[in-house]
Structures are given as C-alpha cells and as structure tokens.
Curated annotation (Swiss-Prot):
Protein name: Malonate-semialdehyde dehydrogenase 2
Family of this protein: Belongs to the aldehyde dehydrogenase family. IolA subfamily.
Gene this protein is translated from: iolA2
Main function: Catalyzes the oxidation of malonate semialdehyde (MSA) and methylmalonate semialdehyde (MMSA) into acetyl-CoA and propanoyl-CoA, respectively. Is involved in a myo-inositol catabolic pathway. Bicarbonate, and not CO2, is the end-product of the enzymatic reaction.
Active site, UniProt feature: C284
Keywords attached to this entry: NAD, Oxidoreductase
Lineage of the organism: Bacteria, Bacillati, Bacillota, Bacilli, Bacillales
Pathway the protein acts in: Polyol metabolism; myo-inositol degradation into acetyl-CoA; acetyl-CoA from myo-inositol: step 7/7
Amino acid sequence: MKNVQTLKNYIGGQWIESTSKQVEDVPNPATGEIIARVPLSTKEDLDRAVATAKEAFKTWRKVAVPRRARILFRYQQLLIENWEGLAKLVTLENGKSYKEAYGEVQRGIECVEFAAGAPTLMMGEQLPDIATGVESGMYRYPIGVIAGITPFNFPMMVPCWMFPLAIACGNTFVLKPSERTPLLANRIAELFKEAGLPDGVLNIVHGAHDVVNGILDNEDVKAVSFVGSQPVAEYIYKTAAANGKRVQALAGAKNHSIVLKDADLSSTVKEITSAAFGSAGERCMAAAVVVVEEDVADELVNRLLQEANAITIGNGLEEGVFLGPVIREGHKERTLGYIQSGVEQGATLIRDGREDDIANSQGYFVGPTIFDNVTQEMKIWQDEIFAPVLSIVRVKDLMEAIHVANASPFANGACLYTNSAKAIREFREEIDAGMLGVNLGVPAPMAFFPFSGYKKSFYGDLHANGKDGVEFYTRKKMLTARY
C-alpha cells in the first residue's frame, strides 16, 4: 500500500503537527486514489496560529511598503517558475483539466502582481487648505490579523485573492484552505517563504468546523474573508459581524445567460458550453441557466447538444480532456439527485450525464447534462447545483428573460448574447447581478476590479479584489492640523 502523508499546519514558518488525532482522506477525484490525509485541526491549533500572526504583525506592519512589494515581486516570479507544477497539483486534488488549472494559476499570479502595487494602493489623500491655516489628510494603515477561509473549487486563485493583498497592506494572515484541496495551499506557502516573507506573516491551519468557529470567536482576528456556499457564508457573516469583525462572505450563484434571436449562435454555443461544463460546473461563475428567445430556442438547443456530445470526459491530467470529475462521491450523488428531480418535475432531459461511461474509472464523474423546458418552480432552476447541469428556459423577449433572471435569490453574474446596443444597455440597467458579460460566458473581472454580486451571492459591504480589497484590508486615520 502506498505510504500517504498526513499534512501539517504551517505556523511561524514551521511545519507543525496538529494536536488533533482526527484526519480526513484527500482522494484524487479522477481516480479515487488517496493522495494525502489532512488533519482536522483544533481550536488550540488555530489559536496558536493567530497568536503567531499577532506577534508577527508588530514588526511586519512597520516594514516599508516598497520592501513588502519587492517580496511580492519575488513571489510572483517563483510562482511563474513553478507554474506547471502548481497546475498539475490543482488538477490532482481538484480534478479540473490541466488546461483549466493552468489558467487558474495564471489568475493567481495576476492577483499577486496586483498586490505588488501596494505603494500606490496604500496612498492616502491630503487637502492643504480645508480652512485658513488648517490642513487635513487621510492615512491608510493595516488592521491586524486577517483570516481567510477558502473553497475547494479554486485552490490557487481564491487564496491568492486574499493573502497577497492583505499582506501587501501590512497585515498578517491565517489561511484555512478547504480540507478537500489542502495540498496547493501548502505549496504556495513554501514558495512565499522562499521569496523572503518573514516567518509568522502567513500561517495555514487545516481543518473544518472547529477551525472556522475558532476564527470567528478569536478576538485577535480583526477581519474574515470567506468564499463558499450560501448557508455557510450567511453563518460566517452573521457570526463574525456579531463578534465585531470586518467580514466579506462570497456565496452561491445561479448565473443566467440570456440569448436573443440576433445572437451569433456559433460563438454563443461555444461560450455557453465552456461556461456551463468547464471545471465540472463547480464555480460561482458557471452558466447554470440559459434563457433563450423562443424564435431561436430549437436551434440553440440542438447546437448545445452537439457541442456537449463532443466533450471529452476523463482524468484532467490526460491530453485532450475537457471535463473532469466533481470533487467527491457525495457531491456526485447529490448531483444525480438533482437530475432525477428535474425529470420528476417535468423538465425535458435532452442529455443525461448519468449515462456517460468512463472506462475503468473509480472517479466521481458526471457527464454534461442539459434540461430543456425548465420553469421557475423546479429545483434545478432554484438551487445552486454546482455541477455540469444546464437548464434551459424559453421566453418571448428580453424583458421576460430579465424577469426570470432577477427572480433568482442569487445575483452573482449574468450574460447576454446579442448584437443590439439597445439590448445591451437595457440588460446593463435592469439585470440584478454584480458581474455582467456580453457575448462571453464567464465575466469574471481581473484582480484590479472588485469581484462578486448581490442578494444571496454576497454578504458584506466590500467585495474581493480591486479597490474594494484595499479598503477591506486597511483602516483610515484622519489627521487635521493647524499651523
């Protein structure tokens, strides 16, 4: 039997065994093979990491901002040099195709690049003459120990949304990565240390509920950034805020793609197919629902079916694979339950991903699944499935399509496929979502713009990334002086 390592926590620049005896297997989702074991760390482990980060903050906050930036530039270079290995590790523990993993690493590197602009990002503001002989200035400062709680679906990109910018702003950080994808977090911590980051500035504590609750209860944690499911996001937001912490919690999604009759169907079908089935549908920007004008619905459905049938399913490390597995057997069973629900509630199942056979595989595969004639009363329209399941709703016109999309309790993203400038303006003004796309499938912004939406897709005031991220990780002091 292959010897499987049990991961350690990263505290104060050292790899330290958890005080917990509980561990959880980490399988390769494409094969079922156990590749590591992750400790379900205790509150004691978490408190030790926070205390270490608090002590490191005393000196890190006083490090000159340009020096912090130079460390981040070295870190960026190391990530670039290790790009392929990082991408393979993402695929190994998450299951997405190597091509998608390679792109995810790129997005993480871009986040570090943005954070390296800290000398500009941290600038304050001054007004020399607010009154005769009186001037006033705003100065930015770090806030202390930040905690990040990240999901399994982007083990590289989402942590890189958080800790590089927080650290660039002078904070110290405790990261709790998903227990389902813990390997990548350890690797990027190693590279940050190699780049010259002082011990204690970045710490990693593996685990589940006990670590999360420890973060929320620890008074030395000043802010919490979270990305994950809606129920957990709501819990974290309410609990952290009640404990006086600054909090941003990015939650679920049910993104609608609206297709008008004047759309270029060739490019539209390719965009929707990639957005719906890429990363096995396990992303908050996935295309979950297509809302199409009746005049082109039949043709669109036929083309989507043809495109889905051409998808190669398998181990993401194999050449040419587009669709990998979902993350765990339990998530596969949950997805199959939603497919059965769609059938029972009367949707037309035009492609059944349950029938895709992956030869000799013990992995957690679900093939591309497409439902037509979906209505708002159905669970497959209402719930975030987080899997390669696409629902199609037929409507008469753009306003009905917007009405359908806005009826969702989620408001993360939405897309419009059209050649009409008037329709684009109407869509922009009337749609209730935070990230909008026109003639593209995944309108995720770059690191210098804020990420996230509204309603049950986001809890908080300041979004991740961009200027919002800088605001979240800093506090302001106003100095008014008479001379």
